[in-house]
Curated annotation (Swiss-Prot):
Pfam families: 14-3-3 (PF00244). The lineage of its organism: Eukaryota, Viridiplantae, Streptophyta, Embryophyta, Tracheophyta. InterPro entries: 14-3-3 (IPR000308), 14-3-3_CS (IPR023409), 14-3-3_dom_sf (IPR036815), 14-3-3_domain (IPR023410). It comes from Pisum sativum (Garden pea). Belongs to the 14-3-3 family. This is 14-3-3-like protein.
Amino acid sequence: MAAAHTPREENVYMAKLAEQAERYEEMVEFMEKVSANADSEELTVEERNLLSVAYKNVIGARRASWRIISSIEQKEESRGNEDHVAVIRDYRSKIESELSNICDGILKLLDTRLIPSASSGDSKVFYLKMKGDYHRYLAEFKTGAERKEAAESTLTGYKSAQDIANAELPPTHPIRLGLALNFSVFYYEILNSPDRACNLAKQAFDEAIAELDTLGEESYKDSTLIMQLLRDNLTLWTSDMQDDGADEIKEAAPKADEQQ
């Protein structure tokens, strides 16, 4: 007879099913239950990756919607279609409300449970990076004092993660590289500091290249993928500084086996 599964194991399995079915809101719910079942115990690498993938997909869909609606709003404004603009603004604020709720949910979980229970260097960096990411997503659409506050919280999260990463993780570690990638995107997009963005991305890339021969087979693929994204952004940003282009900036993407 098969051994009885704990509620925690059952919820992990349900989260994987929800991921396969691309039902990410439910995946979030299952992983929040896993976190609750864990009490003060740390999540496993698999569990934290599933949680990250779930939230990244839920927030990613709304971020994409917000960008599309904002673009349409700008076009309608330039055409002077005030009636349309008013309708679009209402719709945009609905999406922004959803974005805020999602970010508030994961940030609360990070502050109350995930960060306090993190014991290893890589899990601390993972969660602090995540904290920076979700404050950055708030900074993308907030304005005025709220945007300033979100940007400051992003910087605090990323800097805390960077301090631990530099001290405890090798330059080739996928989580350290993913942090550098997203931190540099923050400098470029939110703080409008292309020089700082390029310096951070270049330093992370160069340090990783210097130690590439120490990479194990396990993380080689993950690390080299993020290094490629760092290089893509550097190429894009240096050409942007010359001709003000607007191609797509790359961020660390969620993966089930190794989450950046």
